[in-house]
């Protein structure tokens, strides 16, 4: 129950009821609250609020008494930062017509108002409403106020997602060693993998058929307070952050109403510019302010059924049952029998991310799978509101045929969901129809705080026994103070530390047990088994968020065990589309070997070549290369003849199969992402040595586009140091492309490529700094990679700490990953030869205006606690 108190003349404060979860232990808990300040009458109907001190808040919304009245002019607000004491510039606040209808739309508690605007932590406010000429606008509605929304602190993390817990109908399955291989090491941690009733694409009961893609026109059923029975879906439920987990108030003003089914999905955006600069680490707080906004407008609860962010997090919106046809308040006249999904951001200006689009498609597919709906079909809906009321474009009782996935603008006079998101609705529908749509969403977030996390492997540490350091991402990048070091002697890690194990030689993130937290796969290719097979190799999987339970396994099938070195490279993705990620591993021994382990332990394995010698430079990348919804794998290696190769493995309902070697030569590194923005993941191959790839003597990177058949050379692009607009020049031994990573650093919707050049020399003062190293960032475009706008970074770059020195090997490993949650991939760069062979990792953030050189941070062995001579910066994940 919310406590109501007067807090000075004209100010009303009420606290939103806290969820039952305890407050975050890392900081003093603060309950959410809303502080209401009445705007002052300035004569002739003009209203505003002069600068004044306030209680703490992070968002604002303007409201007024009459829900049908409209504010005159443009509402604007500016706020004072609680830390710096500086006042912001004026922010425009968009008026938002009410979207509730039916009984909820007739409530006396409804108020007119605006959308809420995120301000960040503030303690001062000023409000004005201005005309086009800059003067104060007259004729404002009565009862106008500004509500200061304080989201409080996040509830404590680590709660098991109710979405998955609710699906458990049997005891969790225990991972067991592969039964066909008696030499497989026993799993030491007795892990469990979440059992769900919807793992299989086969429905548990027959869904309602739709007959044809277009339903006949019929009046929309009246909503009912009766709670219908949940329906099973043909699609596995995606991981959803529940209301309890994001800290929703349960002080609902009423009870939910229900339709009879879900017929369509309506896609929205929050439409606020400040949401574009929000970190995904702040999305839970933003959810609480959106709920506060909707409460302030008089809604029963948050109006949307689901909300997603640019990192692909999915949030439960309106209460009443995620698997039920809950009537929302998101599209007046069309709230019944639709599911409303809002994307945090203003997509009139921002571009939607691949992760955000995939998250929407997963929700659509799951909800539609309950009713046998084709996401790419059409539906005829009947308007339940008079034309012109709150923007509704369709007269009461009139039918309109719409795509099953449509935008708010299709039925309402609004730009929502924005000029950049609206054209993506067809792709969302197509993705929702793919056979592998039940796939686990890609994640590198082990603590589920909304921000991807970094792994620095040091397999050469401690006499090559190996260690691994997990560094959580944060609002300012990797948080070294919160690091976790894992060895084979760490609590819960299977096995024991031994010289030569090379624990941490490879690592990969993914949600293996389907609980929403990223789990960590770790390679130890030098591990010996207990049956006398030296260097057989081992893969260890540790469950997030604690990373203190897990399991291990080794080679299986007919692969020669001795010298296999399984775990030399790893990739994690949902190869069979069952909602839980699977693990791919490869080893160098006896012509090379590979192993794909599905959830539950079923394993497929084989050899890469028929040679008896060892292959080299294994590197794996996963992505959906043919856009069928199943994760695929591209594996780079150098064969025994010294030639680089890339072999494609295709995902399907039965798992991963070896499709064959592609025509483009391999190199020493590989990465995946959608470079040309067409929805197919592409690969970028690092080809640093000419004799292996047939490329330039100093090295190159080659982007190979994904296609419905796997890969195509049509549209293939190559970047090297002699490419137009690339700084520097080709020199033998530069090792351009020795490491490579793919990510969207400028949030333009095209993945970019980051290439390490650890062999680059830097002459300084007449002295050549040999193998000092640097990196090149090449931009992605609709036609592939380009040298135009490319950026070179070294330790001699202005603002970057340190200096280029002989043997630093800057660029020995690279990661182009968003470690701050702002939707732009940051640069994380390894220099394993820095400070002798101690090594460093340098973090360089990507800002809205470019790279933040002055915010670059070096993480040394002191900061990360790695041993001396550990070669920190040799491997980075993701």
Segments predicted by a language model, with ranges:
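Beta-sandwich interaction modules
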Residues: 12-13, 44-56, 73-76, 81, ...
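Beta-propeller blade termini
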Residues: 438-448, 457, 504-512, 567-575, ...
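A detector of repeated loop/turn-to-beta-strand junctions in beta-rich toroidal repeat architectures
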Residues: 463-469, 480, 519, 533-538, ...
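Acidic/hydrophobic-patterned starts of short beta strands in beta-sheet-rich repeat architectures
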Residues: 449-457, 514-523, 577-586, 627-636, ...
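Short glycine/acidic-enriched loop and turn motifs that connect beta-strands
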Residues: 459-463, 526-531, 589-592, 638-642, ...
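Blade-edge motifs of beta-propeller repeat domains
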Residues: 432-440, 472-502, 541-565, 596-615, ...
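C-terminal region of N-terminal signal peptides and the immediate post-cleavage residues
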Residues: 8-35, 433-440, 449
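Basic/polar, cationic surfaces and motifs that engage anionic cell-wall
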Residues: 143-185, 191, 195, 203, ...
């Amino acid at each position: 129950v919310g406590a109501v108190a007067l807090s000075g003349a004209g100010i009303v404060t009420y606290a939103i009821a806290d969820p039952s979860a305890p407050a975050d232990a890392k900081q003093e808990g603060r309950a959410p609250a809303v502080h209401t300040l009445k705007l002052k009458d300035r004569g002739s109907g003009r209203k505003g609020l002069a600068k004044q001190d306030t209680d703490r808040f992070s968002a604002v919304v303007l409201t007024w008494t009459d829900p049908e009245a409209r504010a005159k002019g443009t509402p604007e607000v500016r706020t004072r930062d609680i830390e710096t004491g500086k006042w912001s510039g004026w922010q425009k606040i968009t008026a938002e017509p009410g979207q509730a209808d039916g009984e909820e739309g007739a409530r006396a508690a409804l108020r007119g108002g605006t959308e809420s605007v995120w301000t960040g932590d503030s303690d001062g406010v000023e409000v004005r409403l201005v005309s086009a000429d800059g003067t104060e606008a007259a004729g404002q509605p009565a009862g106008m106020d500004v509500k200061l929304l304080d989201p409080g602190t996040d509830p404590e993390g680590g709660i098991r997602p109710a979405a998955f817990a609710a699906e458990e109908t049997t005891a969790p399955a225990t991972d067991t060693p592969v039964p066909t291989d008696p030499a497989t090491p026993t799993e030491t941690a007795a892990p469990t993998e979440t059992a769900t009733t919807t793992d299989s694409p086969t429905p548990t009961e027959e869904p309602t058929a739709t007959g044809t893609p277009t339903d006949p026109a019929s009046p929309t059923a009246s909503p009912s307070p009766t709670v219908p029975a949940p329906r099973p879906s043909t699609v596995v439920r995606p991981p959803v952050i529940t209301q309890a987990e994001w800290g929703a108030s349960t002080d609902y003003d009423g009870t939910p109403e229900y339709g009879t089914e879900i017929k369509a999905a309506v896609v929205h955006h929050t439409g606020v510019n400040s949401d574009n600069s929000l970190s995904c680490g702040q999305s839970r707080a933003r959810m609480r302010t959106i709920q506060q906004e909707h409460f302030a407008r008089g809604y029963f609860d948050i109006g949307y059924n689901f909300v997603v962010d640019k990192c692909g997090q999915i949030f439960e919106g309106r209460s009443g049952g995620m698997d039920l046809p809950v009537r929302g308040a998101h599209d007046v006249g069309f709230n019944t029998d639709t599911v409303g999904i809002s994307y945090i951001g203003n997509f009139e200006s921002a571009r939607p991310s691949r992760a955000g689009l995939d998250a929407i498609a997963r929700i659509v597919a799951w909800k539609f799978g309950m009713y046998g709906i084709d996401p790419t079909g059409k539906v005829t809906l009947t308007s339940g509101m008079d034309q012109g009321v709150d923007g509704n474009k369709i007269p009461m009782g009139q039918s309109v045929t719409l795509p099953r996935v449509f935008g708010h603008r299709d039925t309402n006079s609004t730009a929502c969901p924005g000029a950049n998101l609206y054209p993506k609705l067809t792709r969302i529908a197509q993705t929702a129809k793919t056979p592998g749509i039940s796939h686990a969403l890609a994640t590198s977030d082990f603590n589920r705080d909304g921000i991807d996390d970094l792994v620095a492997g040091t397999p050469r540490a401690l006499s090559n026994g190996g260690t691994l350091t997990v560094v959580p991402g944060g609002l300012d990048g990797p948080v070294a103070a919160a690091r976790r070091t894992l060895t084979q002697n760490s609590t819960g890690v299977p096995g024991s530390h031994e010289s030569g194990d090379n624990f941490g030689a490879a690592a990969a993130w993914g949600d293996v047990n389907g609980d929403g937290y990223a789990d960590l796969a770790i390679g130890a290719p030098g591990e010996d088994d207990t049956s006398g097979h030296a260097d057989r190799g081992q893969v260890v999987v540790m469950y997030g968020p604690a990373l203190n339970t897990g399991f291990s396994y080794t080679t299986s099938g007919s692969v020669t065990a001795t010298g296999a070195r399984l775990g030399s490279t790893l990739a994690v993705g949902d190869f069979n589309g069952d909602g839980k990620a699977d693990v791919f591993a490869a080893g160098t021994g006896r012509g090379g070997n590979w192993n794909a382990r599905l959830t539950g332990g079923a394993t497929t394995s084989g050899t890469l070549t028929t040679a008896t010698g060892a292959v080299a430079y294994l590197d794996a990348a996963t992505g959906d290369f043919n856009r069928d919804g199943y994760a695929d794998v591209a594996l780079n290696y150098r064969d025994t003849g010294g030639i680089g190769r890339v072999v494609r493995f295709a995902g399907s309902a039965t798992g991963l199969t070896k499709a064959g070697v592609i025509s483009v030569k391999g190199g020493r590194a590989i990465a995946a992402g959608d470079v040309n923005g067409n929805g197919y993941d592409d690969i970028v191959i690092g080809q640093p040595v000419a004799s292996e790839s047939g490329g330039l003597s100093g090295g190159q990177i080659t982007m190979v586009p994904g296609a419905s058949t796997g890969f195509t050379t049509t549209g293939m692009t190559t970047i090297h140091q002699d490419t137009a607009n690339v700084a520097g020049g080709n020199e033998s031994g530069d090792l351009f492309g020795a490491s490579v990573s793919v990510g969207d650093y400028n949030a333009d919707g095209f993945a970019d490529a980051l290439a390490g050049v650890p062999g680059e020399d830097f002459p300084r003062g007449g002295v050549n700094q040999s193998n000092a190293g640097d990196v090149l960032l090449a931009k992605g475009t609709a036609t592939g990679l380009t040298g135009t706008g490319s950026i070179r970074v070294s330790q001699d770059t202005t603002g970057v700490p340190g200096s280029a020195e002989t043997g630093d090997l800057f660029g020995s490993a690279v990661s182009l990953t968003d470690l701050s949650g702002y939707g732009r991939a940051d640069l994380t760069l390894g220099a394993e030869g820095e400070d002798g062979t101690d090594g460093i990792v340098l973090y360089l953030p990507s800002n809205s205006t470019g790279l933040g050189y002055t915010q670059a941070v070096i993480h040394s062995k002191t900061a990360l606690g790695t041993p001396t001579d550990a070669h920190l910066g040799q491997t980075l994940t993701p």
